[in-house]
Amino acid sequence: AASPAWPWMTAVGIAYVALGVYLLRFLQKKDAVPRDAKKREAMPLFAIIGLIIAAAARLIVANSVSGYQVDVNCFLAWGNTLLSVGPANFYQTTNFCDYPPAYVYIMGLNAALMRVLPLSAAAVHKLIPMACDLVAAVLTYRIARKKNASANQAGILMLLMAFNPAIFLNSAGWCQIDSVLSLLLMLVAYFAVCGNWMAVMPIYMLAVLVKPQALMLGFLGLAAIVMALIRDRKVWKPMLIGVGLALVTAVIVVLPFSVNQGGISWLIDKYAQTLSSYPYATVNTANFYYLFGCNWTSIVMEAPRAIPLLMMALSLVWTGWLIYRAQKSGWQPDVLTGLMTILLIIGCFGRGGCFATQSGWTRTMIFHLGG
């Protein structure tokens, strides 16, 4: 049955898009303020107040909406199990857990916070994803300022991020953790663009240990590494240090869960099991598959493959057009972005273009808004 809130959600979505279109001209405007003066501008008051309102609104919704009960119940059970038996016996004790170790720690923390905070159990499990929403919004502000946007322009972008209905609903209403993974991937992209490879590698490792879907961006990361090495071969040293830090991160996170597992193969089996446990075109509702009645349709059938193939082809055509325009204008960053996009599309298709995860649109939205 349709949710009774769908008319309001539709109206809010349309209003948000209309507002974004209205503000687009202002966001594209180049003012006459010198670059040095722009850098000295502080975050405007309206942006700070807006961010506080976004946080307060999330808390109200989080405590009022129960969330997706299937996942909420899993989070509650897994968090309490971790508190009861510890990481060494966690996976052996729980009947089912398709999450890697990193986020299991957060579930355990949430289980402990439930005993002291005057919030509903679901609301407590929403706190960290909601915090990541807001941190991602602030990171968007920082990126915009580094791209020479004025403080007002960056503040508007930040609030568009903070009040995005899809992102808001996903964490505050639906109790999903996509914002955690999305923020980590934003940081990976941000530090990669800045050339800070000693930060890129461990953060990406942490992202993979939060949700295995981060592996799907490995192709894009590999392309970025290759291009960075082509531009400057000296970066291999910080990259090597970053790889070492990534391994240290993995050991710190995984080792407590491995004590009684008899080796590291259990983690590989866990990832393989998780990635193969949803062999369906989609298991959510925010896509065309659901509109055509194809929810839970097996990807073994050939018909569902037509849509991702078509979308991949359209994406390649669009990317090719962007590269052509960039070459004519001489803007090399666009060319590099286009090439990396092609590699990402082909890479994701190679890993299984039909694999759709819950609320994957949220990760895409945060990642592209942040970029």
Identify the role of each PLM range:
Residues 217-248, 259-260:
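Perimembrane helix-loop-helix junctions
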Residues 138-142, 180-197, 369-371:
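Specific aromatic-rich, kink-prone transmembrane helix
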